[in-house]
Amino acid sequence: MPSDKPVFDIGSQAPERSDSESPSSRSIGSGTPAPVRKGLSKFKNSFLSRKNSSQIKSPSDYKSSAHEQRVNHTTDSMAHVPGNNSPLQTPQKSPPRQKHTAPATPIPVSASRHHKPHHSGLKNLLEKAMHPGHKSNANSPTSESPSKGFGSFINNHILHKNTSSHPSSPVNGKSSDIHKSQSYQHLKNSPPNSRTARKPVPRRANSASHNLGSTKSPNGNAKESLSRSAELPSKAKPMEINNGYRKKPSPLSPNSSIRNREGGNGSYFDGPLTASPTPSSPTGTPNSMSKSPSLSSLASTGASYRPGPSKPLVSRVRDNYANTSYESWPHSTEFDMFTYAVSGSLKLTPQGTGFDCINPANPFSPGYSGKSSMKSDDNVGSSANTAPNSPTSANSSEGNQGNGPTTYPIKPPTNISEIPRKLKSGFIPPYAKRVVPRLSAKYKLVDETKDMGSGATAVIRIVTLKNPKENEKNLRFAVKAYRRKADDETDGQYIAKLASEWLVQCRMEHPNVVKSYDLCIDSHIFPLYSDTWCAVMDFCPRGDLLSLIEDRHDRLGKKDFECMIKQILRGLNYIHSQGIAHRDIKPENILISEYGVLRITDFGACDVLCNPGDDITAVESKSMGIFGSDPYMAPEILTPGSYNAFFADMWSTAIVLHCLYFRTYPFRKASQNDQLYAKYCKAWREYNLICDVQNIRISKTLPYFKPVNDLPMHMQRLFFCLANPTAEQRITAQEALNLPFVQEIECCSVDDCTCTHDAPEECLEWANPPVQKLSTPHNHL
């Protein structure tokens, strides 16, 4: 059989030999002995006979259906299987399956000269990649168009790119060798939309999604196709699109990331900065997928609004008092007292010049020219004292939201003493922000960026009068700008707390107590907040007592310590005489004026317990709650139940005395769990046994307690009397000042009966207390 060739040549990469080649030439070039070739020829004939007798299926029998072609991807080795001298067809255009008829005689393998050899799949792909322009036979009618190498293979077989636009692509833009993926078949079988032209699929991008041409899914619903960077849809489960945005994944989806929250085209930070809400904004809109309520719903339902990240700081709520007059607003005795207190009409604040009308919305403000329904005291009658919960007050408050004039008579208090010092949330009118003056109307910031002090609740800035008098040009004031309210506070509770602190501090007229002047609203100190509540008070440029102890403790002597202790006792005695307990005495809340005078400040934790001068009620008064710092808290505050806040202030004064001398605390906490406090209680009991009722020392030796044993002898007595573990046995501030050795202390500060007589105004008599001339100047001055 001269036309036969060895079986091991089938599937090799060598080109076919023509029939004209002689057997001698083939035998010479072959490396296999003749007997072996003869045996292999017998095996080849047996193989061909079984194939022709239908024992071995022809390659056409292995063709799969259209559904199997989409699911089971074919390879080049399957595409190049020869069949009946017919050109290769793509799976989409394959002829219908026909029954194979076996020929009468065996057909040799090389019967067709134009037939391609059966190459292995991997070798064929590598050959196509290395030789893109190689053809099997130049004269073959089934020769393929030139391939584009590895790039074409990756684009068609892996990335499923559409290469129909390329001039070298196969006919009709389809690959004759590689079947398309399932996603490609889904997109191909979907008919294009008649309204929108089909756009080419873009390349991979970093953004999450790209809006392409609109197509229709097999069920007829309009869908937006996605880019290849997103998950490709399948025919069984296409990607769901809603208004141009991808739907949110399920909460348990692993793809739930920050990029899934974006909306529109582009990446997370590519959205335009516009005021219109987006799906990521906190306000709900008809087209957004956010479940947060809209601002209009918040305003209508009165629900509490909590600012946070990516949310507006202040909810836009409609102001019912914007274009109405004060006479048409709801009124009550408490509302009018608050309006009168913050009006500036009393001689509590420095007026300056050019302030004929501090607040046009406040009828008690100087120079108010609006319509006023205030009546004289003779015509007021009993309706002036109507309680806020009475029917008259309720009707007037309910029907005066800007619809008409009120029937409630507006009666101003005669003086500040009629205004309560401790306000409740019901005392605050709903129009409180409109009657409180603006800080910029009277004052101006000295340095808008520098903070003189900062704490958990407020920051301190410096202001001066905007239009001062000739002798007020050098005056400087401290403005305490409060931070925002807590999340669990209402507006009424927040304003009542700030107003109560201001009402207490504005009545302080003592050289050792800081006085407050104005309660204002500002929008410049905290630019992010629309309205910041501020309190204007005396300015102490030398800082607080804690800074003096830390920085200049080595320069302070015995006389300095004694003078400062006496000034603290004086200021605390005055505060207690007004029926007020401070409840937060510590070095941080004791400031130093320009001349070295110590002044107590920060009445945020104070409690109004009785009327001024009521000593009987002061002893029996009780307070509730935990206030202050742990090292300065009295032991009764740390135990459940009520306590007398006046005695708690005396305990705190004893701890401040210890800090002045030793720059440290005697113990961390006044609790039995503290070992130092347990030792102190033992030393105090031993000390009390050797002293008589008047605290006169009988024995020459004292029980050893190092934190107290190093104090001077008279200061030891004062410390044990102030820091008595039993609250009712502690001495008061007045009793401490009456001690003989305390009265002998030379103090640089003037007494409470002496004030600045040359002050510009009556309210500024205690703005900068003078000092006395001493024989030996103190180092803290």
From Swiss-Prot:
Catalytic activity: L-seryl-[protein] + ATP = O-phospho-L-seryl-[protein] + ADP + H(+); L-threonyl-[protein] + ATP = O-phospho-L-threonyl-[protein] + ADP + H(+)
SMART domains xrefs: S_TKc (SM00220)
Compositional bias per record (Basic residues), positions renumbered to this chain: 112-121
This protein's record includes keyword Cytoplasm: yes
Stretches with biased composition (Basic and acidic residues): 64-73
Gene Ontology cellular-component terms listed: cell division site; cytoplasm; cytosol; nucleus
Cellular compartment(s): Cytoplasm
Enzyme Commission (EC) number: 2.7.11.1
Region (Disordered): 1-315, 368-417
UniProt name for this protein: Probable serine/threonine-protein kinase C70.05c
Native source organism of the sequence: Schizosaccharomyces pombe (strain 972 / ATCC 24843) (Fission yeast)
